[in-house]
Regions:
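C-terminal motif of bacterial Sec signal peptides marking the signal peptidase cleavage site
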Residues: 25-29
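Exported/periplasmic ABC-transporter solute-binding proteins
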Residues: 8, 31-39, 44, 49-311
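Bacterial Sec-dependent N-terminal signal peptides
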Residues: 1-17
Length: 311
């Protein structure tokens, strides 16, 4: 009887011990479960970081080159061809930008940029001291060079500015008066309204004062007429000349792009896009315009319209 009681008590004790072990095991398991939830394994963390990195790499970078808004230019009629060509190319690259231009003369352009009614003032001359004193900055974007040509058989190789002016105003009418053969001078020029004619007449101080034997409507026509006419003299954009005519030196300086860039050839003028203050002080859109105009693409446009580049 006593032995039975002892076995019962021993069984109860084992049951209690088993229950206690089970409880402790459960608590530990719960504790481990919480820890696992709070801190993922190193493998899981690495995989997550890799996924984030891949997502970041796959996402496209935000562009910073998008431009929008408008640029206004006012000024030189002689710069119309250049301004329009540059505007077209710039707006093609930046479709959300509008470039407007009014061609009302250099003086009006400088006035507009001075009083703030235009972003850019186009001028086909250098700025005057008083204009610079008002804070206007001269930004030369191209150079207009004009060559004087004669037929290849002409003995004359050089003219002074005075001689050239006197030939075109009708004072000098024979080549022997300027060191050539005894041959009448046939004065060839462009039609009224031509930008080349306007530039030439302005540079020799003969606006509307030239006495032409022939007025032709294209550069090619002028060159062809001079080449085929003994005693003829004409003018054309430097880049348009070919071997069918002979270019004259002026004041002892040959008509070359290098001499024009150096300012040694007088029959040339700057094409200026003036700003009120330095380019770096303008808004982002205007700064982008000058980056384009003075960059490779803009200078290529200038060359294509017959101008001397500045870069």
């Amino acid at each position: 009887m006593e032995d039975i009681i002892m076995r019962v008590r021993h069984s109860k004790l084992l049951a209690l011990i088993g229950a206690g072990i089970l409880a402790v095991t459960t608590l530990v398991a719960c504790g481990n479960s919480n820890a696992t939830t709070a801190q993922p394994s190193a493998v899981e963390s690495s995989a997550a970081e890799s996924t984030v990195a891949e997502s970041s790499a796959a996402a496209p970078a935000e562009t910073t080159t998008d431009l929008s808004g408008s640029i206004s230019m006012v000024g030189s009629t002689s710069m119309e061809k250049l301004a329009n060509a540059l505007s077209e190319a710039f707006m093609e690259e930046y479709p959300d930008v509008t470039v407007t231009a009014e061609f009302v003369g250099s003086g009006a352009g400088i006035e507009a940029v001075t009083n703030g009614t235009a972003d850019i003032g186009n001028s086909s001359r250098s700025l005057k001291d008083e204009e610079k004193a008002a804070g206007v900055v001269e930004n030369v974007v191209a150079i207009d060079g004009i060559a004087v040509c004669v037929d290849p058989a002409n003995e004359v190789a050089d003219l002074t500015k005075e001689q050239l002016t006197n030939i075109y105003n009708g004072t000098v009418t024979n080549w022997k008066e300027v060191g050539g053969a005894d041959e009448p001078i046939i004065v060839i020029g462009r039609e009224a309204g031509s930008g080349t004619r306007g530039a030439f007449e302005e540079l020799v101080d003969l606006v509307d004062g030239c006495k032409y034997a022939n007025e032709l409507d294209s550069t090619g026509a002028v060159i062809a007429k001079v080449a085929s006419t003994p005693g003829a003299i004409g003018y054309a954009s430097l880049d348009a000349l070919d071997d069918s005519v002979k270019a004259l030196s002026l004041e002892g300086v040959e008509a070359t792009a290098e001499n024009i860039k150096a300012g040694n050839y007088f029959l040339s003028r700057p094409f200026v896009m003036a700003t009120k203050g330095e380019i770096s002080e303008q808004n982002d859109l205007v700064q982008a315009w000058f980056d384009f105009v003075l960059g490779d693409e803009g200078q290529q446009v200038a060359s294509e319209v017959g101008l001397i580049t500045v870069k």
